[in-house]
Design a protein with these regions (language model features):
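Phosphate/pyrophosphate-binding loop motifs in nucleotide- or prenyl diphosphate-using proteins
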Residues: 2-133
């Protein structure tokens, strides 16, 4: 899948209604922008951004890892939708199972190179970015 094909469609970035420090959830409920639910959604969004940065720096021979990371981004997006109570989105156990499977695949591919060692982020720009993600 081409990296440019993975973009999500967004209708608008502004509601033009003002906010007084509040925002609306998908179900219409108003919450403070510094509420726990918005903190969690913001953290998931930040994680997705870091994963996207890692994807952007992957070389062509890492297509299977790119597919896994792209699926993780999609899962984070859906999890955020569940958290803000979007009624049309359900985060299924299958997605959590897939996340565990992806982790196992990545661990197997790296076996022997890191297990049992304390890891320091860095070494390469991509490794440092993956450490942040």
């Amino acid at each position: 899948m081409d990296k440019k094909q993975k973009k999500q469609k967004m209708n608008s970035i502004s509601t033009k209604t003002g906010d007084c420090g509040q925002t609306s959830l998908a179900n219409g409920e108003r919450v403070a922008k510094d509420s726990l639910v918005m903190e969690v959604v913001g953290t998931l969004d930040e994680l997705s951004s870091w994963v996207g940065l890692v994807i952007a720096h992957l070389e062509d021979n890492f297509s299977s890892q790119e597919d896994i990371l792209s699926q993780i981004q999609q899962d984070l997006y859906q999890l955020s939708a569940v958290i803000v109570q979007a009624p049309q989105v359900k985060f299924k156990k299958l997605a959590l199972d897939q996340l565990e499977e992806h982790s196992a695949v990545l661990e197997k591919e790296m076996a022997g190179s890191w297990q049992g060692k304390f890891l320091h982020p860095g070494g390469t720009k991509l490794a440092a970015q993956l450490g942040v993600a």
